[in-house]
Curated annotation (Swiss-Prot):
GO terms for molecular function: heme binding; metal ion binding. Its main location: membrane. A lipid is attached at residue 20 (S-diacylglycerol cysteine). It comes from Staphylococcus aureus (strain bovine RF122 / ET3-1). It comes from the Bacteria. This is High-affinity heme uptake system protein IsdE. InterPro entries: ABC_Transporter_SBP, ABC_transptr_haem-bd_IsdE, ABC_transptr_periplasmic_BD. The keyword Nucleotidyltransferase does not apply. It is found in: Cell membrane.
Length: 292
């Protein structure tokens, strides 16, 4: 009997000890043993909204959350420094699916699995927010953020659908020295559609196409949006010069009616970001400012 009693106590003790160790291990993971390195600004801003610490951040001229001010920089989003990242001993290095192919050599040098998230549209970003919440124990924060974005989107769509006429919109995405035309497949194109605008470009298989001003004149948009990507002040000056020196622009209805607008990188940008609520609201107000 004594032997049986002793074995029973021993088994119970082992079970309790194992349970405690398991609980401790799970709690350790929950309490932030993740060492996360986002390689893009959009991901960095999203992690901030999810109340997640990071050990590395992308190098950018944009203002990042103050909570990350002392976090080491790891280089540009498409060219992160492998050695700088390795020094941080990350558990997760995050990127976006748009540049997945370009980032594969980087992950190979790191000898790490790549984590890619869809930030090509509002819907894609919201799905990614849910994934990040599940992955890093921030489900409640992810739900709260998505609920807010859904609420703003629904309000904008409900107001837009009541408008009798929807403006035809041309979207130009500029980089220093040149510009492209954005389609519905781009993030900014997605926002324009949500806000009640009709993109004059009907291409379905690409996010951006090259510009042909003569063809654009034939579809004569009501509104022209100009969005900078990188070096915004330089791009803004480039657009101003183009519209002043290229005579064809003066024949556009949008130019004649002074309906050409320069968008700011914040809250817009070429990839989805957590400022989408502000971007949707600004576009709606722009499209229907005379019909409130």
């Amino acid at each position: 009997m004594r032997i049986i009693k002793y074995l029973t106590i021993l088994v119970i003790s082992v079970v309790i000890l194992t349970s405690c160790q398991s609980s401790s291990s799970q709690e350790s993971t929950k309490s932030g043993e993740f060492r996360i390195v986002p390689t893009t600004v959009a991901l960095t801003m999203t992690l901030d909204k999810l109340d997640l610490p990071i050990v590395g951040k992308p190098t950018s001229y944009k203002t990042l959350p103050n909570r990350y001010k002392d976090v080491p920089e790891i280089g540009q989003p498409m060219e992160p420094n492998v050695e700088a990242v390795k020094k941080l001993k990350p558990t997760h290095v995050l990127s976006v699916s748009t540049i997945k192919d370009e980032m594969q050599p980087f992950y190979k040098q790191l000898n790490m699995k790549g984590y890619f998230y869809d930030f090509d549209s509002l819907k894609g970003m919201q799905k990614s927010i849910t994934q990040l919440g599940d992955q890093f124990n921030r489900k409640a924060q992810a739900k709260e953020l998505n609920d807010h974005l859904n609420s703003v989107k629904q309000k904008i769509e409900n107001k837009a659908v009541k408008q009798k006429k929807h403006p035809k919109v041309l979207i130009l995405m500029g980089v220093p020295g040149s510009y492209l035309v954005a389609t519905d497949k781009s993030y900014i194109g997605d926002l324009v559609k949500i806000a009640g605008g009709e993109n004059v470009i009907k291409v379905k298989d690409r996010q951006y196409i090259s510009s042909n001003t003569e063809n654009l004149l034939n579809i004569n948009p009501d509104i022209i949006l100009r969005l900078p990507h990188g070096m915004p002040e330089e791009v803004k000056k480039m657009f101003q010069k183009e519209f002043k020196q290229n005579d064809i622009w003066k024949h556009f209805k949008a130019v004649k009616n002074n309906h050409v607008y320069d968008l700011e990188e914040v809250p817009f940008g070429i990839t989805a970001n957590v400022d989408a609520d502000k971007a949707m609201t600004q576009l709606y107000d722009l499209f229907y400012k005379d019909k409130k």
